[in-house]
Curated annotation (Swiss-Prot):
Name the UniProt record assigns to this protein: Cytochrome c oxidase assembly protein COX19
GO molecular function: copper ion binding
Locus of motif Cx9C motif 2: 52-62
Domain CHCH: 27-70
Length: 98
């Protein structure tokens, strides 16, 4: 006897995340964006600052571009849409051209 009637092994099966898998970035393709975001969060003491949210957007865009997550609308991720005429440029793209 198991000592715990009514339990089954199927109840112990892990369930996948609600929005699908979130693969690790084994090749470090988006590490730079992640580190910039984390550094920003540290500077603002983990407050929800807009400049950090825009860095998070750059990080998520990198993950989408490298097939590390599915493409999704920014509004579904709680982030502002790209400005018209921005052509999907990131903050880093804009500052790298200076």
């Amino acid at each position: 006897m198991s000592g715990n009637p009514g339990s089954s092994l199927s109840a112990l099966r892990p369930t996948p995340p609600e929005r699908g898998s979130f693969p690790l970035d084994h090749d470090g393709e988006c590490t730079k964006y992640m580190q910039e975001y984390l550094k920003c969060m540290q500077l603002v003491q983990n407050e929800n600052a807009m400049n950090c949210r825009l860095l998070a957007k750059d990080y998520l865009r990198c993950r989408m571009d490298h097939q590390l997550m599915d493409y999704d609308e920014w509004s579904h991720l709680g982030l502002p849409e790209d400005a018209p005429g921005n052509n999907g440029k990131t903050i880093k793209d804009a500052t790298d051209n200076k």
